[in-house]
């Protein structure tokens, strides 16, 4: 079957060239349908030799929906002033370049956090940067869930008190492990945490920043506040100041 026959006929479908490369290299066997469509990306269900996969596609038209994306990109090396200008102008070239940068950065963060022992979806391309570049704006990672469906986000669940506390403690440990690894998620809440087999899985990392980023501490404090607020809906009462001290004390 040709690569274009595996791809849905829609504006935000995975790009044919990148999917062809993933097929030829044996990373991907098939795309079966859409899992989720958001402002920044669409996620499709794929099949690989090692099982189900999430095929996340950053769309150039959607890059504009990242609020203050320059804030997160600060300090990231691009090396081409023309590309920087195109991104700043939001031209077609700039939007495409930005989609590629978000995808490459998410791959880098997935590999880094996996090595640090943080529960994230296993990246299925890389860590070689040339392979990641070939994948373009497509992030291929292990699917969290099973044949019956994807793992739910914590924001979509109503947990029993004991489960809610266990999930919160797990999420705080993950946040602390990221900080020790030199990473701040920068969009951390129950909306970006999956609950699978009684464990938290951290997702959505394109906006993650280095711990030496000029606004890292502010972004970390915001992450902690968001985590405490969204877990408040599950009945967990945790003072953000205490949680922040716990996260940064290790």
Where are these regions (language model features)?
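Intrinsically disordered, low-complexity regulatory segments that flank or precede the catalytic domain
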Residues: 1-7
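Conserved ATP-binding subdomain of kinase catalytic cores across diverse folds
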Residues: 8, 15-150, 176, 180-181
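Residue-level "edge-of-site" marker
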Residues: 126-127, 191, 244
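AlphaC helix of the protein kinase catalytic domain
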Residues: 149-160
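C-lobe/activation-segment region of protein kinase-like
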Residues: 160-167, 179-185, 196-250
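Catalytic-loop signature of eukaryotic-like protein kinases
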Residues: 187, 191-193
